[in-house]
Amino acid sequence: MRRRGQLTTAVAGAALLLGCVAHPAVSQPDHDGRRVLVFSKTAGFRHDSIPAGVAAVRQLGERGGFTVDATEDAGAFTSANLRRYDGVVFLSTTGDVLDAAQQTAFEGYIRHGGGYVGIHAAADTEYDWAFYGGLAGAYFQSHPAIQQAEVNVEDRAHPATSGLPRAWERTDEWYNYRSNPREHAHVLASLDESSYTGGTMNGDHPIAWCQNYRGGRAFYTGGGHTGESYAEPAFLAHLLGGIRWAIGDAQADCRPENGYRPLFDGTSASLAGWQQAGPGSFTLDDDGTLTSSGGMGLLWYADRSFGAYSLKLDWKTSGASGDDNSGVFVGFPPSTDPWSAVNNGYEVQIDATDVPEKTTGAVYGFQSADIRKRDRALNPPGEWNTYEIRVQGERLRVWLNGVKINDFTNTDPARSLRDGHLGLQNHGADDQVSFRDVRLKELPAKPSVRTASQGD
């Protein structure tokens, strides 16, 4: 697989050539841009939407700057050929489509950092190949008739779902799965089983998810049965975001996420426990986004303080200047003065330019983030990022889009992380930073031996 790096100019592929790897209309050296292989071989039911799906991925390649080849020839699955691609899309494949040698080559490709995208019947594929089952996340079990349903968008930062409404209504053939992937994959969206008939997953029905799997990246969406799906702008944006993440052009936290409770869920009701300290404010947008204005002030969670916890939240800078300033404060006492948080707590910074200990991912003024890891994990201005801030005892750790970038221990006797409040900073008139979905899970006061041994 080619080296992951910054996106450069690329072109989309030419017309679909069945039975062989299609060559792009304009050929390029492998180091120029990204390349994606669409694989649509079927050994069982064949979806008549496959040609529309191939054409759609080609169009997404034009929009996203990656070259698209398409094939139904399993002979493309050799180690040498797969190294040409940053991602492989299984487009409504069915049945046993690869032989043992081809499976081994694909496993090696994933283990060396390759990307996988599964669309719809990719979950109805290779039931006797355990590696593939883990990669896809879940196997197909059954489906009711095509009908409209409501999709609950659970992750509003991942590029596959960040542009979707929280409640997304669309028509498709809705799969039931043999198992629930939630424990080992990161669920991006799920079906509201009360909104349609035929759901059999007892009210917890994931329909799109992502995961880091055996060295590679895997994204799956259950949509895409109908040809009309590939003309829907929202579904195409969903698919493009999934491909971009799988091939490494966008970053996201795809670790499993369970047991969190919302502190802010995008509704005005969830702001009841928060108070504004100091000048400025936050505006709640129609899509459930909080955006800072003026300052310097602090929107802090006044309902209660916290000791040991994992705090997750999604954030982005405006994209206009690329240098907006904000931060997430932890471990401070209750106060109507925003400077109390500065002087008594700790800030995990959001700021593109300053000295290292005062830029994004830093514990502001105390410890820089790992700059190399931070820069690789960071999405650019205008795109969403996810922080996890984990506090246990006097230890504070920071993950950016699933990558640990800071590990700080408080030694200042005048400050303590063992109990304190949380807050979001509105820094000034020229700084516009947006937040979504602030959620928290309480933890034991000390990391478990197993967690510590894993380097978490």
Locations of regions flagged by a protein language model:
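Catalytic beta-strand/loop cores that center a nucleophilic Ser/Cys/Thr
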Residues: 138, 142-215
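Carbohydrate-interacting regions of secretory-pathway proteins
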Residues: 125, 138-142, 254-456
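Helical hinge/lid and interdomain linker segments adjacent to catalytic or ligand-binding clefts
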Residues: 35-41, 45-124
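Secretory targeting and sorting signals
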Residues: 2-27
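Active-site rim elements
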Residues: 44, 146-148, 195-196, 225-233, ...
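Solvent-exposed loop/turn segments at secondary-structure junctions
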Residues: 42-45, 74-76, 93-97, 116, ...
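A glycine-rich, often tryptophan-bearing local segment used as a flexible ligand/cofactor-contacting loop or short
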Residues: 95-164
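Extracellular ligand-binding/catalytic regions of CAZymes and related secreted enzymes
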Residues: 30-34, 40, 59-66, 72, ...
